[in-house]
Amino acid sequence: MGRKSVRAKEKKQKRLEERAAMAAVCAKVQAANQLGDPLGAFPVFKKFDRNGLNLSIECCKVSDLDQKTIDWAFELTKTNMQLLYEQSEWGWKEREKREELTDERAWYLIARDELAALVAFVHFRFDVECGDEVLYCYEVQLETRVRRKGVGKFLVQILQLMANSTQMKKVVLTVFKHNHGAYQFFRDALQFEIDETSPSVSGCCSDDCTYEILSKRTKFGDTPHSHTGHCAGCCH
């Protein structure tokens, strides 16, 4: 009985510690989501003035975007990504993509040129993935005329900056393997690594899975998390 009692107490203590750890993770995510402007402390990053471009960049929640901007973001995503989705096991589903872009948890980086024309956006969220507090990048979409001028790299670097300032452990994103340009961009130019939750590492999907999950750790995520059980979020 004595041994069973000790084991029971140890299990209870472990559960309490796990709950406390998850509560701390959720608190960080909630604090990040309550910010008015995560980019506000870094005004120098609100301008991109190089390679013939003069862009202004703002960070806001989806609730602060007008319908015209939301429609533009959807159409740009469709133009850039529909074929890639159709070549994957996911397929292209317009209703689901629009719902994803307009989810109440969505944050945006919006880039405009000197005439206030919309030229690029990033859709991201502060969230919990597999027990870790993360900044999850859903979309990085650019109009053709501003590509290959450093805009995409600059926007992702902003994500890394905000992830550090909000004490997230890493920036995470999903990329199609057959989207060779994007895959090389994140792996080579930005030094993202294949995440431990990616199908090719976790073994959760077959070998012909068409996507990888990539990540880049912040200064708060130096030690990889030891996951148990299924991946799930909180704070919703």
From Swiss-Prot:
It is found in: Cytoplasm; Nucleus. Its EC number is 2.3.1.257. Pfam families: Acetyltransf_1. One of its GO terms (molecular function) is protein N-terminal-serine acetyltransferase activity. The record marks 139 as: Essential for catalytic activity. Substrate binds at residues 85, 127-129, 138, 174, 211. GO terms for cellular component: cytoplasm; nucleus. Keywords: Acyltransferase, Cytoplasm, Lipoprotein, Myristate, Nucleus, Transferase. It catalyses: N-terminal L-seryl-[histone H4] + acetyl-CoA = N-terminal N(alpha)-acetyl-L-seryl-[histone H4] + CoA + H(+); N-terminal L-seryl-[histone H2A] + acetyl-CoA = N-terminal N(alpha)-acetyl-L-seryl-[histone H2A] + CoA + H(+). N-alpha-acetyltransferase that specifically mediates the acetylation of the N-terminal residues of histones H4 and H2A. In contrast to other N-alpha-acetyltransferase, has a very specific selectivity for histones H4 and H2A N-terminus and specifically recognizes the 'Ser-Gly-Arg-Gly sequence'. This is N-alpha-acetyltransferase 40. It comes from Xenopus laevis (African clawed frog).
